């Protein structure tokens, strides 16, 4: 590895005995513990046997080489994990999912009608709007759905205003609407944004006929399309099977006995490659020399190929590593969002 001076370190240590083999806890996607280049360096839990019993009484059955925190009792493993933003959106969906912003005013569609919304917990609502919304495709898809209702309301308002201005005009044009309904300089609403959207649609369809554009913006099919888009987004990003496969409460750090001992996951190639950089036999022709040929790899699975690890899994994996003598703990990449309470679990574990 460039910059690490590993070869020089081995020269310096030549002739010296290793007092204890360091344990490197690799927290990530899993590894192939039977890989010929790694199996001599796989950590073994000396207090555990592969006999279907929890021999060391730590709550994890047959954790001989580590543990999988995204696995189920039946041997299944979650195929992917959601991003933290999606998990947080689903946590707040019933409170804020149907809230949209119009300038300085927020509206809620919780009752099926547009009503002014005032949050009971301003700090929580600001966290949702400023942090969760930006990191959630689901939140944005749902907001778009409700914004279609807002744009329809504005379109009806524009129609009313332009017809009041030109009561006797037979054919109203989009240009008429833009002229009459343009927002003032002090207007903080999304009136101008809706008008701009109307212009874009009119230009795309190469028409200046207000009646045809009006029908597009108030059509019921727009609302149906918005719901279908949200449903497609949810199907892709909104359910990673945690409840069905793992079955724990991911928001309860005390609900800690879950998972399985499956370390060879569908995404284990990533971890196997990383492990091969860290440990293994040196001097083998055709292979790169690893950093530490005497180290052992403890495998802790918290992540699949897609998404971001659950912070509860991360915290428990760190605690597992410490409790079982890890000298070094390697974490996966940072999450995009750290909810305050769950962040505290991580801090306490570290």
Regions found by a protein language model. Give the residues of each.
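Substrate-binding/specificity loop regions of serine endopeptidase catalytic domains
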Residues: 310, 333-350
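Aromatic/hydrophobic pocket-lining residues that form the small-molecule binding cavity
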Residues: 314
């Amino acid at each position: 590895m460039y910059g690490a001076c590993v070869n020089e370190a081995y020269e310096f240590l030549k002739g010296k005995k290793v007092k204890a083999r360091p344990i490197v806890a690799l927290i990530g996607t899993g590894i192939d513990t039977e890989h010929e280049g790694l199996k001599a360096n796989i950590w073994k839990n000396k207090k555990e046997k592969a006999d279907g019993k929890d021999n060391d009484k730590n709550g994890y059955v047959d954790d001989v080489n580590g543990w999988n925190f995204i696995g189920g009792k039946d041997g299944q493993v979650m195929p992917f994990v959601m991003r933290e933003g999606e998990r947080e959106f689903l946590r707040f969906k019933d409170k804020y999912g149907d809230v949209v912003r119009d300038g300085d005013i927020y509206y809620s569609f919780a009752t099926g009608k547009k009503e002014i919304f005032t949050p009971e917990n301003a700090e929580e609502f600001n966290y949702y709007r400023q942090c969760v919304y930006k990191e959630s495709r689901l939140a944005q898809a749902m907001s778009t759905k409700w914004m279609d209702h807002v744009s329809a309301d504005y379109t009806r308002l524009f129609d009313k205003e332009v017809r009041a201005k030109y009561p006797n005009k037979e054919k109203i044009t989009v240009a008429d609407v833009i002229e009459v309904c343009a927002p003032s300089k002090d207007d903080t609403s999304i009136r101008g944004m809706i008008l701009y959207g109307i212009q874009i649609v009119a230009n795309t369809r190469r028409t200046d006929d207000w009646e045809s554009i009006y029908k597009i913006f108030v059509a019921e099919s727009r609302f149906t399309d918005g719901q279908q888009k949200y449903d497609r987004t949810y199907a892709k990003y909104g359910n990673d099977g945690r409840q069905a496969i793992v079955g724990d409460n991911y928001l309860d750090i005390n609900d800690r006995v879950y998972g399985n001992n499956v370390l060879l996951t569908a995404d284990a190639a990533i971890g196997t490659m990383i492990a091969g950089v860290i440990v293994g036999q040196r001097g083998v022709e055709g292979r790169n020399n690893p950093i530490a040929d005497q180290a052992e790899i403890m495998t802790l699975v918290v992540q699949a190929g897609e998404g971001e690890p659950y912070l509860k899994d991360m915290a428990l994996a760190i605690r597992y590593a410490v409790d079982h003598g890890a000298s070094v703990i390697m974490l996966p990449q940072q999450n995009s969002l750290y909810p305050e309470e769950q962040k505290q679990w991580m801090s306490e574990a570290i």
